Amino acid sequence: VSTEEEYEFKFNREYKNFNPDGGDCANFASQIMYESGRFKKNSIWNYNNRDGTKAWVNAQGFKNYILNSGRGSLICKGSYEETYKESYNLRPGDFVAYEKGGRITHVSTVTGMDSKGYPLVTCHNTDRLLVPWDLGWSNKTIRFHLIRVHY
């Protein structure tokens, strides 16, 4: 069982649940990356003693770190209409960041594809397992950032 499946609806006790502090989405995405064994913690992206750095626990900080560190690259960003075709280039392990009012307010991890190749995501906050990446984000002002992770 993968990290995202095992800890989607029951949180991993090795990590703090950051929902009371504003959200757990970036913490969960960081756990998935770290538990994959392909990424080591560092001084900027780190979790220790029940606390995490901004890059580990904050959606905006997480997205900025992934892109600025070279651990990921932007596939595209924009409205749903501007990004849905490119979304078919997402692969399990990649991320979607959701921008509202000029700020990244949520991130989710691509964890599968439906029968037509449409990306499915898993995330915390509104806990979801294998749902379409755009589900619940129909507000026309939302901008999506599709991010390829370099594993």
Predicted regions: what they are:
Residues N42-W45, V107, W133:
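Short, solvent-exposed loop/turn and secondary-structure capping segments
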Residues L120-R128, W133-Y151:
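Low-complexity, Gly/Ser/Thr/Pro-rich intrinsically disordered linker/tail segments
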Residues G23-I32, V107-T111, T122-C123:
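Active-site scaffold segments
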Residues S36-R38, R91-F95, I142:
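Loop/turn elements at helix/coil->beta-strand transitions in domains of secreted/extracellular proteins
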